Amino acid sequence: MSKDLYKEDILYKKRHSIAHVMAEAVCDLFPNTKIAIGPPIKDGFYYDFEFKNPITEDSLLDIENRMREILKTGSSFEKEIISLEQALEIFKDEPYKIDLIKNFDLQNEISIYKSHNFIDLCRGPHVDNMNKIDPKAFKLTGIAGAYWRGNEKNTMLTRIYGTLWNNEKELRSYLNLREEIKKRDHRKLGKELDLFSIHEEIGPGLIFFHPNGAKIRALIEDFWREEHSKNGYDILFTPHVGKSWLWQTSGHLNFYKDSMFEKIEMDKSDYYLKPMNCPFHIAIYNTGKHSYRDLPFRWAELGTVYRYEKIGALHGMMRARGFTQDDAHIICTHSQVVDEIKEVLRFAIYMWSKFGFNSLKAYLSTKPDKSVGNNSDWEMSLKVLKEALSDFEVPYEIDKGGGAFYGPKIDLKIVDSLEREWQMSTIQFDFNLPERFNMTYTSEDGKEKRPFMIHRALLGSIERFFGILVEHYGGAFPLWLSHVQAVIIPVNNIVEDYTIKVFNKFKNAGIRIKLDNSSSRMNAKIREYQAKKIPYMFIIGEREAIEERISIRTRTNEQINGIELDEALKLILLKVRDKEIS
């Protein structure tokens, strides 16, 4: 559901209203608390407070009980338009509200909402009265720190999160889903499965891939390169830093500097770690002259970029400061645009299917009020994007005015096994950089023209994609992506020669296999490797050795007894080749 549609939804109004109820309950229980903001969000709501004394999650139950008492009053939510002077008087003891009021656009009206004994600076919307909210359908879910206005230089506030649904059944369903999400948290599984780590003492937001995780990442990247080569892309490698003139020309220093690392002074010049790969690809293009006969260029790179994300925004692999972007840029003529866009969309759908994502949603962002490029190019580009989405029957919503100033775009979102949407692929026209860097090609009539430039990311950040895969599969990667695909577990030492034969046969065929001939008990080994999410355990006893067979136990506890060795190898190789998900 889009943001605009959500605002009209009854749940949005209920969640907005319950946030006010929570703020009143907090102020009742903790006098002298200062209130900040409390909006509805996806799946719930929050409110930020400055407490005189810190609170803990132990206080949440008391707050919930007080909220239910307030809800029982059935009080109305009443909107009132007030003047600037009235607002300053009403909230004179609330410094965060005063800060908001002083930054208001005075051309807009100032509105407040009154409910029970609480008044808040608010645009709404809300439910008519508290009877519309089921007192058994909400729960406070946690406490976190949040800087006022998201600025680390400001006061750290206490944010209380909650969730609210239409009824108790919906709430229970959501809370069960939250528990499953916690179990699958990539940070938790990353540690348990020895996939990656983050070392705050070395640098927050920087990912260290361990051997297990590095193997999986290498498999992802190898597949990425192979498929890009098949689809007519040339692979590029570019530096991690560039001089300031490059970022000045691209516009990053004017519009993106807050998200860039500080400059590095060296050789009497200023350098910056790259936040994006685009200017480097353009530099390669501009090393020579190009004819219309040379185009299109499809250039792709797994390029590491660095972005100065705020500490509070960092979240494991999902939000990092150093990550590898699967960038591509297509440089083409006007007549090639339609085919190139359709091919990018087809390629994106194909790539996602190979990783087990078959449910896609798209958001088409149109021209904002301020933009570069002429109207005809914008209109043509939007038409092409719409046509491509229709041809591939991808459902989409239009984000009116949501395009970047330099061109329209499609954002593709995948839906994971927990029914969460993740924005991954972007297909973005750029009318800005070709102009800034004076990109040209010689057209059929011998004149110099600007090429069209399309930015394209499929997987987005490799690190983020890795984290999504961990949670999507709960750590149980498909066979083709598992760092170890099978483990041989001999029943006793008598079958040692045969287990070595099996090990060598599978290893030489390219299967990632391990032989465990330790003294641990067989059942303990099976439990260990199931916990490690290894797809197959080959159980070999004397009968299997005599008949040259194996028995297979899967990580989901399925049993296949006495399968012929060559048949087992053939089946596994087929699953790997076809990149089967199950």
From Swiss-Prot:
Main location: cytoplasm
Co-factor: note: Binds 1 zinc ion per subunit.
EC identifiers of the protein: 6.1.1.3
InterPro entries: aa-tRNA-synt_IIb, aa-tRNA-synth_II, aa-tRNA-synth_II/BPL/LPL, Anticodon-bd, Anticodon-bd_dom_sf, Thr-tRNA-ligase_IIa, Thr/Ala-tRNA-synth_IIc_edit, ThrRS_anticodon
GO CC, alphabetical: cytoplasm
Region (Catalytic): 185-478
Top EC group: ligase
Catalysed reactions, as listed in the record: tRNA(Thr) + L-threonine + ATP = L-threonyl-tRNA(Thr) + AMP + diphosphate + H(+)
Record-stated family: Belongs to the class-II aminoacyl-tRNA synthetase family.
Name of the protein in question: Threonine--tRNA ligase
Source species: Borrelia garinii subsp. bavariensis (strain ATCC BAA-2496 / DSM 23469 / PBi) (Borreliella bavariensis)
